[in-house]
Amino acid sequence: LYHLPPRALPSIQAVEGGAVGVEHFNANGSADLGVMQINTLWLGPLSQVIRQPREIIRRRLVGESCFNIIAAGAILRTYLDNEKGDLLKAVGDYHSHTPALNLDYRRKVIAAAMRLTTR
């Protein structure tokens, strides 16, 4: 759908550790929602693209795994385009634009991808 490598989203999900119904509240007042732990900062952009109110988008991200994963794919694709095709930078951006946090997250996702290939 978004021309992403097949293990990209499953590897991110393995690191995020989210699930249907999960909301993780952050110190900055935002929350991470559902299977892919999509941050509430994305509610506005997703609402504009999908043309649904933010509250409906939020409920769907929390309660509908397929919707959540599709949204995560769109987010990763956005970052991949922003990073001119650099998948590792895009994966790090999915978590944080702070360099140290970005790099640490990339390492975790690479490790998760390696585990997925050895199953």
Identify what each model region corresponds to.
Residues 1-119:
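Catalytic glycan-binding domains that act on GlcNAc-containing polysaccharides
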